[in-house]
C-alpha cells in the first residue's frame, strides 16, 4: 500500500504557504508557460513539493504528470520568496526554479497557440510557448513578475529573489 501524497502546503486563516518547484523550458528563445483554463495569468510549469521529496525530483514528477514526457531537470536558477494575494488569499510561496530540458518530441509552436493540455485534479491546464522577453511576458500576465526579464539570463549561481506585493504580508 502506498502512503497518501502530502504536498507541502498549508492554510492558516486567510493565508497559505506553498513550497513549489518550477521549470524554465526554453526553445528558440521561447519559454513554456501554463495556466488553468479559467485563470487570467500564466506561470512556469511545475507544482508543489511533497513531504520528503527533493525539489528537483518534484519538478521531474510534475513534468511527467502534466506533460507526459520525462524532463531533464538542470541547474537551479532562482530561489524566490514570493508574498502575494490571489483570490482573497495571502500567499507565502517558496519557489525553486530550475532549467528544464524537454525532448524534441514535445510539441513546439512559435505562434502562441496552445500546444498541450491536461487535467490536474479539477483544473484543466493549457500550455503554450511564448517569446521569453519581459514585454511579452508582461502582456500575458506572467507570474511571478520578478522573473519576466530574467528567463534568458545566462546560467550562473542561483539567484535569491524576495518579492512582496503591496499589502500581501
Give the label of every model feature segment.
Residues 27-65, 69:
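Conserved Nudix-box catalytic region and its N-terminal flanking loop in Nudix hydrolases
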Residues 18-22, 93-97, 124:
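Short hydrophobic/aromatic beta-strand or adjacent loop that forms the aromatic wall/cage
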Residues 29-31, 38-39, 50, 82-83, ...:
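Short, charged/polar surface micro-motifs in flexible loops or helix N-caps
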Residues 40-42, 107-109, 113-169:
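Nudix hydrolase/Nudix homology domain
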Residues 25, 99-101, 128-131:
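Short, well-ordered beta-strand micro-motif
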Residues 84-113, 150-151:
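Active-site-adjacent beta-strand/loop module that shapes the phosphate/pyrophosphate-binding cleft
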Residues 1-22:
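Acidic, metal-coordinating catalytic segment for phosphate/diphosphate chemistry
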Residues 70-79:
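A short coil-to-beta-strand element that immediately follows conserved catalytic motifs
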Amino acid at each position: 500500500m502506498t502512503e497518501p501524497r502530502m504536498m507541502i502546503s498549508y492554510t492558516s486563516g486567510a493565508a497559505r504557504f506553498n513550497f513549489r518547484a518550477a521549470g524554465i523550458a526554453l526553445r528558440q528563445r521561447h519559454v513554456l508557460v501554463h495556466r488553468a483554463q479559467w485563470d487570467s495569468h500564466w506561470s512556469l510549469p511545475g507544482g508543489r513539493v511533497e513531504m520528503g521529496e527533493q525539489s528537483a525530483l518534484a519538478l521531474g514528477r510534475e513534468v511527467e504528470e502534466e506533460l507526459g514526457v520525462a524532463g531533464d531537470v538542470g541547474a537551479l536558477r532562482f530561489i524566490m520568496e514570493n508574498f502575494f494575494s490571489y483570490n482573497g488569499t495571502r500567499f507565502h510561496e517558496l519557489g525553486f526554479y530550475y532549467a528544464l530540458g524537454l525532448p524534441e518530441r514535445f510539441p513546439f509552436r512559435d505562434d502562441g497557440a496552445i500546444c498541450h493540455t491536461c487535467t490536474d485534479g479539477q483544473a484543466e491546464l493549457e500550455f503554450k510557448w511564448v517569446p521569453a522577453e519581459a514585454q511579452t511576458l508582461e502582456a500575458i500576465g506572467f507570474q511571478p513578475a520578478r522573473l519576466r526579464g530574467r528567463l534568458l539570463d545566462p546560467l550562473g549561481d542561483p539567484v535569491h529573489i524576495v518579492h512582496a506585493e503591496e499589502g500581501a504580508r
